A protein has these predicted regions:
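Cytosolic/stromal cytosol-facing helical appendages immediately following the last transmembrane segment
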Residues: 13, 19-147
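Helix-coil boundary and interhelical linker segments in multi-pass alpha-helical membrane proteins
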Residues: 2-12
């Protein structure tokens, strides 16, 4: 397309593509940011009651997606509610009213206090906010490579 008009191609296609890729990479990194050091496959979160789910096919129910990848997007919220005891046992972090870019920004600025304010304490998974904060810090700390 640049043979037609380079400026139009650059601003409409190239910048949009690069911006979209960066946002998607930030989102993907955030979806898997809270790594359980005991079970490395247990690293996803759920964002519930957020506008993002309405426009992105319930993508923010990411832990549900990992457990049931073939589930139709309209069935994901019900699946989450049906299996909430499993997510409590796994200590999967459910955030309410925020999406991945909020979480990414607060992780990069170490604002765990803001993250804790948006954690849903399902079935009293956490005794205190400090316990939720400690879990988040534990799951985002630097891991040592196996030697």
């Amino acid at each position: 397309m640049s043979f037609v008009n380079f400026n139009a191609t650059f601003f409409i296609f190239i910048i949009s593509f690069v911006f979209a890729r960066i946002v998607m990479m930030l989102g993907n990194r955030t979806q898997h940011a809270f790594v359980n050091p005991v079970d490395l496959e247990d690293n996803s979160i759920n964002c519930i009651n957020t506008k993002y789910n309405k426009i992105c096919w319930n993508d923010a129910y990411h832990a549900v997606h990992h457990n049931r990848p073939a589930l139709h997007y309209t069935d994901i919220p019900g699946e989450f509610l049906k299996n909430k005891a499993f997510y409590v046992k796994q200590r999967t972090l459910p955030f309410e009213g925020i999406h991945f870019l909020h979480i990414f920004a607060w992780l990069m600025t170490r604002r765990y206090d803001k993250l804790v304010r948006n954690v849903v304490n399902i079935d009293n998974m956490f005794a205190t906010d400090e316990e939720a904060n400690a879990l988040m810090k534990d799951r985002t700390k630097k891991m040592k490579a196996d030697t």
